Regions:
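C-terminal cap of thioredoxin/glutaredoxin-like
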Residues: 3, 16-32, 36, 111-211
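Aromatic-flanked redox-active Cys/Sec active sites in thiol-based oxidoreductases
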Residues: 5-11
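Structural alpha/beta surface segment adjacent to cysteine/selenocysteine redox centers
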Residues: 15-114
Length: 211
């Protein structure tokens, strides 16, 4: 099974969905390849948002409490990082990690740094420390980001997501080309969605202008 996972590091639904997806695939025993597709909710120079003091967002995030409990994710909903960071550099770091065989580990580390440990993933120093934790050279990693080694690649990827895939929001998940819509992000729901790729519902996600 080929899975395309469109996401952003500051989207709480994305972390929960990725963990539910992994567990569901494990239970199904499906041979699946997951391709991550970057999508920036707040691309520069758009003004960053304060999710921490936004009561509407807090209320929306409550749907994640039960799946977080089931998946053993101690997430801060939302994390106390004000304003919410841009994610361009984090994605550039991901491309570096992919080139050095640590893409998946880096992805997991960035999500957890933001939503569990409340670290500012918009800062190169934070990203470099995460890179080192997954076995990458923090010095070369920092140099790559400062030199913009992956800036154009990241820009093209986000442009592709916006102009070709055109997701309503993130996460957007395609299984063998068919879009999955999720309501509550539980493992059970993900199992149902994967078993029937036509499964859909109203869905909850982070849109371009809100999350």
């Amino acid at each position: 099974m080929e899975i395309l996972f469109v996401s952003d590091y500051v989207c709480p639904y994305c972390l929960v969905a990725k963990e539910a997806l992994r567990r569901a695939l494990g239970k199904l025993g499906v041979d699946a390849h997951i391709t991550d597709q970057p999508y920036e909710l707040t691309p520069e120079p758009k003004e960053r948002v304060d999710t921490y003091h936004d009561q509407r967002r807090r209320a929306n995030y409550q749907i994640l409490e039960e799946p977080c409990r089931q998946l053993e994710l101690d997430m801060k909903l939302p994390p106390k990082i004000i304003p919410r960071p841009y994610t361009q550099l984090a994605f550039e770091g991901w491309y570096y990690a992919c080139d050095h065989g640590r893409g998946e580990e880096y992805n997991d580390s960035v999500y957890r740094a933001y939503f569990i440990r409340e670290q500012d993933i918009g800062e190169i120093t934070v990203l470099a420390a995460l890179a080192e934790q997954v076995g990458l050279d923090p010095g070369d990693f920092t140099k790559a980001l400062e030199e913009g080694r992956y800036t154009e690649k990241e820009r093209q990827a986000v442009q592709y997501a916006r102009e070709v895939l055109k997701p309503q929001g993130v996460p957007t998940i395609y299984a063998d080309g068919k879009k999955l819509s999720l309501n509550d992000y539980t493992e059970a729901e993900m199992l149902q969605a994967l078993n029937d790729a036509s499964f859909s519902g109203p869905g909850h996600f982070c849109g371009p202008d809100g999350c």
